[in-house]
Amino acid sequence: MIIFFEIWHWSWALLGCYLNLLLAYLAIFKSPKAIKSYATLIINYAATDFVECALDSFLQTRLLAVPGEAELVYIFNGPCKYIGSISCKVGLSFFLHCLTHSVWSLLLSFGYRFYILHNPSLSRLVLLKLILVFYIPSLIQALTYWTIFASREEILPLARQWFPYYDLDAETGVLTGIIDLTNFVAIYSIGHICLPFFPVYITIFILRQKIINQLHVKQHVMSPDTKAAHSQLLKALTIQAFIPIFVGIAVTFYFLSQSGLVRSPILEYSIYAVAILAPALSPITYLYFVRPYRQNVKRFIANPFKILLNTNTGSSIGVFHSGGRPSNFATTLNTSR
């Protein structure tokens, strides 16, 4: 079983690293002038998801939640086990902070999409400040969560009692855990990981409906290309909103394990195995729907070296895929009120 999940983690993590690195490159060097400010949000996504994918391959985590109790046991089977337990603990803290920051970033993207229906687009500096504000809760989580992990010597005797049906002494990975989930750091971190997810998604879909309603109201003053561009961006954001549902599935798996309703090593491995799908698949939405990015991807596939040598943005017009016809992104970001 461990071999299957090891292959799973490596495959999705490497794919995610490649796609997010490609997206970051395109957002930095190939974004038309008209979407330079919005590209700040795209770069934020790509950087966050790249780090998340890289850390997933580094950690390859198995989570054993003690049924009905306030304790957790982690087993790290990735390369971090060859460096030391502290690297696994810090790595997990930063992996989880990437996961939460991705969710907040998605909310920011939908909020910004709604904002520019009524206002001019914001500068890159203002967007960067907003990203930093949304990042603060996740940063606090990253800097504190790893400090509450117990050592192998502390957790192993307890883990034997909690999971007598496992031979945990034979585990070759780094064994650690949290003995008390009721302390403030644990409550903050676990709460920040699990609780905002569903309220944020409800808010996102409310914003999505408001955006659709506003587009219907304003459609008589929009050009066909502008309406098509808004429609395609909304589709991209909607698809991107569904991709992190994998995180929701992982959270559900965790609650099933913590409640004791389901006990299975497959479930324990699957919590983090499912979560990696979100950052690995997320960049595809931008790589496909943002027309300049999609065109550069096609050119890259045809000639992988030429695009790396040419970092000029080229055009000042950005368009979204719209049923085969171009849509001006400049008008998308500056819709008339």
From Swiss-Prot:
<comment type="similarity">
    <text>Belongs to the nematode receptor-like protein srd family.</text>
</comment>
<keyword id="KW-0812">Transmembrane</keyword>
<feature type="transmembrane region" description="Helical">
    <location>
        <begin position="130"/>
        <end position="150"/>
    </location>
</feature>
<feature type="transmembrane region" description="Helical">
    <location>
        <begin position="187"/>
        <end position="207"/>
    </location>
</feature>
<feature type="transmembrane region" description="Helical">
    <location>
        <begin position="236"/>
        <end position="256"/>
    </location>
</feature>
<feature type="transmembrane region" description="Helical">
    <location>
        <begin position="2"/>
        <end position="22"/>
    </location>
</feature>
<keyword id="KW-1133">Transmembrane helix</keyword>
<feature type="transmembrane region" description="Helical">
    <location>
        <begin position="90"/>
        <end position="110"/>
    </location>
</feature>
<dbReference type="Pfam" id="PF10317">
    <property type="entry name" value="7TM_GPCR_Srd"/>
</dbReference>
<dbReference type="InterPro" id="IPR050920">
    <property type="entry name" value="Nematode_rcpt-like_delta"/>
</dbReference>
<protein>
    <recommendedName>
        <fullName>Serpentine receptor class delta-18</fullName>
    </recommendedName>
</protein>
<feature type="transmembrane region" description="Helical">
    <location>
        <begin position="270"/>
        <end position="290"/>
    </location>
</feature>
<dbReference type="InterPro" id="IPR019421">
    <property type="entry name" value="7TM_GPCR_serpentine_rcpt_Srd"/>
</dbReference>
<dbReference type="GO" id="GO:0016020">
    <property type="term" value="C:membrane"/>
</dbReference>
<keyword id="KW-0472">Membrane</keyword>
